[in-house]
């Protein structure tokens, strides 16, 4: 043949690039609204809020599909090592939510008898399927300066614009 390996490699890579080059007709598959917002056995839409005294209580809600009949939340004082911790388990109040897209179960728990000014770790699930551990800090019994970020309901362009608002707010929020 008399062709060098260097020339062969150059020709081969050039021809290969023709096979993998993008074309104008390619479009990403758009996921339907029904599929995109379908609940599953995995908890999602986890929302932490206060219900009473922020030094000693905290409430959490989350969504699952309707096959999950009972929800639970586990909570414990967060430790520095991140290793196992002693947790208390709370049974959720489960409510059926009907919408034009799909039905879901919403689960709600209020953690009580918490220690003031303490960092807690919590997770939610059905006893088999759990979220990761999330953290919050209870308020102090004495008035102290604090900051918070308030978000309204964006409704539209959540991925393209609203996610940037979240990142910017967390970056600029004083601690």
Model regions and ranges:
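Short, Lys/Arg-enriched N-terminal segments with co-localized hydrophobic residues
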Residues: 1-4
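Divalent metal-dependent phosphoesterase catalytic cores across multiple superfamilies
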Residues: 26-175
């Amino acid at each position: 043949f008399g062709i060098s390996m260097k020339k062969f490699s150059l020709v081969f890579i050039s021809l290969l690039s023709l096979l993998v080059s993008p074309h104008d007709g390619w479009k990403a598959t758009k996921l339907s609204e029904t599929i995109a917002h379908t609940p599953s056995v995995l908890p999602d839409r986890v929302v932490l809020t206060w219900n009473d005294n922020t030094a000693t209580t905290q409430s959490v809600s989350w969504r699952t599909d309707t096959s999950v009949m009972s929800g639970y939340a586990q909570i414990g004082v967060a430790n520095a090592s991140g290793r196992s911790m002693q947790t208390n388990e709370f049974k959720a109040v489960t409510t059926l939510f009907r919408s034009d897209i799909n039905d879901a179960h919403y689960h709600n728990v209020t953690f009580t008898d918490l220690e003031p000014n303490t960092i807690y770790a919590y997770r939610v699930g059905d006893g088999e399927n759990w979220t990761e551990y999330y953290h919050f800090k209870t308020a102090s019994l004495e008035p102290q300066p604090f900051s918070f970020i308030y978000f309204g309901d964006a409704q539209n362009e959540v991925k393209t614009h609203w996610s940037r608002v979240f990142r910017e707010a967390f970056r600029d929020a004083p601690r």
